[in-house]
Each structure stands twice: as C-alpha cells, then as structure tokens.
C-alpha cells in the first residue's frame, strides 16, 4: 500500500494495513532545520521559490518518515494576497503578518482578491506540480487558512472578536470574503495536483469564542469549504481546531470534513467521543517532539495508536528545532503497529 493509498483510504474510513503518520503543513508545518541542512534548502528563501519549496517538503518526507507532502509552510499566503503585509521570518521562524490590511471591519473594501497566478500563491501551485511529477505515490496536502484565522490576519483580532457580539453582519461579511479567497487558493492547489485539503482555524477555538459563536461564525463556513472540495473536486478534507474543544461539546460531529484534528490537550478518547463518526487525527505533543527523547515519543505514539487514533500526527505541527530522530521514533512506531495490534 502506497503512502497516498493509505492516507486516502484512512480518510474514507476504509480498512488500512496501519494508521498513516502525517504532518499536513501550513500552521502544522513538517519542516525542521536538520532537513534544511540535509537538502540545502532553507527558510525563508523556500517560502518564495517553488523548486526550493518542493525540494524541502520532499526532503522532509524522505528523511523523517512523515508520509505526506505539505505546503505552504505557513498561514499567511491568503492574507498577503488580500493586502496584509507579511514578513517571511527566518531559518527558525515562520512567515507572519506584520501589518493588517484593515484598520477596522468597515475597511473591507480595501481588501484585494487573491490572484493565484502571482506571488506566493503561484509559488505554491508551481511547487505542487513539481511534487506531483517527482513523487506521485506520496499524498500532497494543500493547506488553507480557516475563515476566522484569515479574518484575524486581516484586521486586529480584538476588533473581530468584538464584532462577533456587536457587529455580526460585518463579521459575517469578512468571513464570507475570507472563505471565498481561501477557496480560490484551494481550487488552484487541487487543480495543480493536491490530493487532500487541510483547513486550520486556530483562531476559532472554543476557549476564545465559545460554542454559540462557533456554531454561527465557524461551523457553516468550514462546512461550506469542505463540501466545496468534496463536490467540485472529489477531495477529502481535514479540519484542525486548536485549544481545548471540550467547551464545544459534540458540535464537532456537525463538521462535514472527513477528519478532525485537535490540540494535544485533548486526548484521543475524548476526541473520539466529541467527534463521533469522524476520522480522528493526532495527537503527539509538538513540545514533546522538540524537547523529548525517542523512547518517550515511541511510548506516546504507541499509546495514541492503542487508543484508536485513525491518523497519527503531531497535534499542532513540528517546531523547526525538532530533532529528526524524534520524528523517526514516531514514524517507526506507526510502521510497527500492524505487527503490534
């Protein structure tokens, strides 16, 4: 079974020889400095160079045992294309917004529409084409910003969160525009050859906005996005929500995404209870991956697998300073699991 076959079957809820081990990309980036050194492609240059981007993610797949290719390596491509100013970071830090595109939600007409033929959006689609040709057996995951996280990259988050209660129509209008642009970026990535969509909305945590606002301002937009990719392209989706999702209750069951990924603070048994019927993904601590040792990571990985996780993955991506040997410990545990089960 190839890596692509295993992941696509797992996302479809079909039987696989063992759970796949993936790290989608985007905010859950799979890139570490040891891989950069090995393939001689580095941040921040790779964020703006399609060939370097492709070579770096392919190197991560081949050197760490992560069973996918994932790009971009950040959550700023859509925001930059819509008018935000972005710094590309450094060798050990991801791109980040340095200036919002809007001073208030009333400035929505200042925003530009993403042009997927230009800038870093074009870099990403070109990188997907390169990867499709070089590694057709490895699944390519296209990463998009969720509507709330994109909105809070375009305007001060405090203004946005305030609007959820005292300016709802303005918040919905910004959500709709954010979703429209994320969909355009996703369409371009899928048309270039991406196999799976991952939508991360870390700014939409239950702790920040509560269940009622999640049901009104997050759930409908995430579901519209995942239905779009399923119906238009036949592609499955993963949705990642940060924070402790207990406050959301079973609202996760209403997500139409095939798979749900959550923070390490949420155990696999709880995730399976809150997102019944969904393919579960997680839940190795990002901090443990960076600061732990291979033996501890092997034990934690085995625990996740024994608890029934469907897709083994870092909870919130991988720190660039994470040792390759720590990632390999997780990969090797996943590969052995079929003989342990």
Regions found by a protein language model. Name each.
Residues 3-31, 36-39, 67, 89-97, ...:
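Active-site loop segments of alpha/beta catalytic cores
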